């Protein structure tokens, strides 16, 4: 069943817009960050991870973003090229801005934290002049990340991408992706999140992220009230995530589809959301039934929280299907389905 119609004649399946960074994950885990001495370097940032995830799943992917004019910027561009992601709309920062850096701390499978360096960074220098209408016209969907809205000029660039997408019939997916860095206050968050949320076709976010988006609209909404609100604005799918308690997708026909996490031996408690998003979007692009798309996303998320990296360990279609098969053989057919 198709919940959203995509223009199948377009060159790209998906084009994320916004944050790209470098992740440093410790190899000497189960220590506080102050004591870790050895790290592996990976591509990071939710839009970038989603781009890699969908490329691994066989989709034609582009990217709109800005990187540092240095070796880290080269690393990003070369990594994208290796994954088959189009880099023609990735530009270099002109005033010495650096790529965002993220250091992770893995104290235990359930206790992880993230330290981000987000001042004077390249991705927030994305400008309206960097947004090309023909590029957006040639993709089935764009993904706008909430972090792109945190500061100007990236904020205006993201809003231009949104307007051009609406003008040209390009599907808009809003990945709320809240990070406290760079925002001035909660009112600012609510204003810009709601601007994009009201114009999107799909919104994906945690309960806490929806609370931030609704900060100037309503307080203490239930999931059902939140879903109805954003569906009434025109969204076709609203996904509300509750971490270890699973997630629910709401659709315009009034239905709610619930999925649980797959049981897996955790290595870390971060990174699953980007894998979930890429695999879920894949299912929607393929026209799958909602429960199948959610199950695919949940399986991909489970695989990522059991691995060391985010981008590097994004799975293929075959790997996710094999994971689901093994999980169902061990735990039963309804292991993740509510």
Swiss-Prot record:
Record's catalysed reaction(s): 5-dehydro-2-deoxy-D-gluconate + ATP = 6-phospho-5-dehydro-2-deoxy-D-gluconate + ADP + H(+)
Enzyme class of the recorded protein, top EC level: transferase
Entry EC no(s): 2.7.1.92
CDD domains named among the record's database cross-references: KdgK
Listed pathway(s): Polyol metabolism; myo-inositol degradation into acetyl-CoA; acetyl-CoA from myo-inositol: step 5/7
Keywords on record: ATP-binding, Kinase, Nucleotide-binding, Transferase
GO biological-process terms attached to the record: inositol catabolic process
Chain segments annotated as coiled-coil in the UniProt record: none
GO molecular function, one term: ATP binding
Family: Belongs to the carbohydrate kinase PfkB family.
Function description: Catalyzes the phosphorylation of 5-dehydro-2-deoxy-D-gluconate (2-deoxy-5-keto-D-gluconate or DKG) to 6-phospho-5-dehydro-2-deoxy-D-gluconate (DKGP).
PANTHER family, alphabetized: 5-DEHYDRO-2-DEOXYGLUCONOKINASE, HEXOKINASE FAMILY MEMBER
HAMAP family, alphabetized: IolC
Protein name, per record: 5-dehydro-2-deoxygluconokinase
Naturally occurring in which organism (per UniProt): Clostridium perfringens (strain 13 / Type A)
Gene transcribed to yield this protein: iolC
